[in-house]
Amino acid sequence: LSRWTSYLDPQWGLGPKGLLPRALTLMVRATHHECDNTVCKLVSGIYGLGHPTLWSHEHLNPQTHEWLKQEFARVPLSFFRQMLESLSAGYMTPVDGYRELPQDVALRRPQTDARFVFMTGRGNRCFLAESQQRSYEALSRYRRGYHSLHVLPGYGHLDVFLGKNAPWDVFPLILAELNRPLPESTR
């Protein structure tokens, strides 16, 4: 693929120009039947294996689904190379050009006092909920009760934030975490 392009672009769904964009758009249209929004279909094809990948359609209102056409743009193939490298390593690896970052960042004690709140939909097909669980457990080995994990049933990846019911289902949870005091032992 990198012989013909350095990126993939969901915007091809609005009018592909060139042989590769047309071929990929036709392939995605033929294999993704979840909706009539070709940009939405391309996003699913680019970012994962789901139908759809980044959200559950029942959580999107028609206006948001239409708005998605303008929200996604070029994705460099270097992103996929980094993801493949990370999968092979079993943890996130530094991206090309930032080799000064430690290779074993996930295997050492965090160099921060930041509190992390992991939030994902159980139906997330972009980054599986299991990855959030593993990250939470890895950080919790160093500070029990400091970080939080929320796996939201029925949600996917971005519908946690874009979903029509997110203001009632998810945002109160985010506010509660933002307002949650730090444990006494960490101040």
Regions found by a protein language model. Give the residues of each.
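Soluble or luminal CAZymes and related metallo-dependent hydrolases
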Residues: V75, F79, S131, A166-V170
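Alpha/beta-hydrolase-fold enzymes
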Residues: L1-Y98
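Conserved beta-strand elements of beta-rich interaction domains across eukaryotes
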Residues: L87, G123-N124, G156
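Short beta-strand/loop motif that positions the catalytic acidic residue
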Residues: T112, F118-T120, N124
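Catalytic active-site module of serine/aspartate enzymes centered on a nucleophile-bearing elbow/loop
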Residues: Y136-E137, Y142-R187
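The feature captures the conserved acid-bearing segment of alpha/beta-hydrolase catalytic domains
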Residues: E100-D113
